[in-house]
């Protein structure tokens, strides 16, 4: 959402047609709800007057970034309270500082747990096909001196079976009114494996990612991406010639697999439909 807000600022500075630019930004990530929320804030700042006040747009984008910095810190503080001394946490995709306006969400919790002497080890799914875990999460935790190991996505079951994981923490792109979660492809599999091994599965969800207008996960649009993300690696064709590819970027984790939602408001527990309905959310003020 923050990146989209600054995208509107750049479009305004360049003299681009702003309604066209906003439509393009909105269509770029249909699964994530906070992108639309941020664009709505920018549209409200534009008003009906012409020419557009670029300084006003800059002010709104900067405010969004500052709000995110503060709320992610609150979210992280709530998340760390769930972790015991010597914990080992498994993470999927990337939810760190370079993905937010602050310290990050799930990865921010892991980093804070390390800083407070609680974390024993972080396990990072490589997160196929874009490898956000291997490329981004491992880099960010490495910069912070957090002990971490990258694993292939399919290794999580064996890791849990061996008793090497105490909690799973992930982020989210959208949470439906009933608590169903849209997140990076592979999240659903991870939640199922965690449930099979009795390991808590936590979703870090800023209020701007909670969408009470979407009744459940079946109503969430799942973005599908280019086949080459799967058929090619570092520019080299690695798939059989003519292989058919299905490449959804996200999946839906049913609410009953979520142990708790870590938010800036606190840790939310079931029943999710009732609990989520009572929140005062930034995207519905």
Where are these regions (language model features)?
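Conserved phosphate/anionic-ligand binding catalytic regions in large, soluble enzymes, centered on
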Residues: 1-4, 34-35, 94-102, 247-262
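Long amphipathic alpha-helical segments
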Residues: 1-49
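Short beta-strand segments
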Residues: 3-7, 36-38, 90-94, 169-171, ...
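Flexible, glycine/proline-enriched loop segments at strand-loop-helix junctions
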Residues: 25, 29, 60-70, 95-99, ...
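Ligand-binding beta-strand-loop-alpha-helix segment within the catalytic cores
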Residues: 34-90, 120, 124-168
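Active-site glycine-rich loop that binds ribose-phosphate moieties when present
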Residues: 73-77, 105-109, 150-152, 183-186
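Histidine-anchored nucleotide/phosphate-binding helix
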Residues: 103-115, 191
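Conserved phosphate- and dinucleotide-binding cores of soluble alpha/beta proteins
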Residues: 119, 125-285
